[in-house]
Amino acid sequence: MKKAYRVKSDKDFQAIFTEGRSVANRKFVVYSLEKDQSHYRVGLSVGKRLGNAVVRNAIKRKLRHVLMELGPYLGTQDFVVIARKGVEELDYSTMKKNLVHVLKLAKLYQEGSIREKEI
């Protein structure tokens, strides 16, 4: 995933948390904030309670890969995905299904309307 598609600064994270809205399911929480930009930006958060650094990094790698696949279906908002307990046990396809579900609830996933892929 290109750096232009990532939320990195603490200021951006705090703006999304304070000004944005949140949606959750059993495995993920998504905070989103509408922005006037040409593509989405995403921040990932995986807490220490999910496991050691190896486990947390594996979760983040899977999430980044799922988000790269879903990129053409995502809007132009900034959003943060927070992994909840139990996500470390999910395989790739189940993780993708759960993430698509919560992104649909947040109205970030636009099924059927594919933007031109920029990733």
Curated annotation (Swiss-Prot):
The keyword RNA-binding applies. It catalyses: Endonucleolytic cleavage of RNA, removing 5'-extranucleotides from tRNA precursor. Its EC number is 3.1.26.5. PROSITE patterns: RIBONUCLEASE_P (PS00648). Coiled coil: none annotated. One of its GO terms (molecular function) is ribonuclease P activity. GO terms for biological process: tRNA 5'-leader removal. One of its GO terms (cellular component) is ribonuclease P complex. Belongs to the RnpA family. PANTHER family: RIBONUCLEASE P PROTEIN COMPONENT. Consists of a catalytic RNA component (M1 or rnpB) and a protein subunit. This is Ribonuclease P protein component.
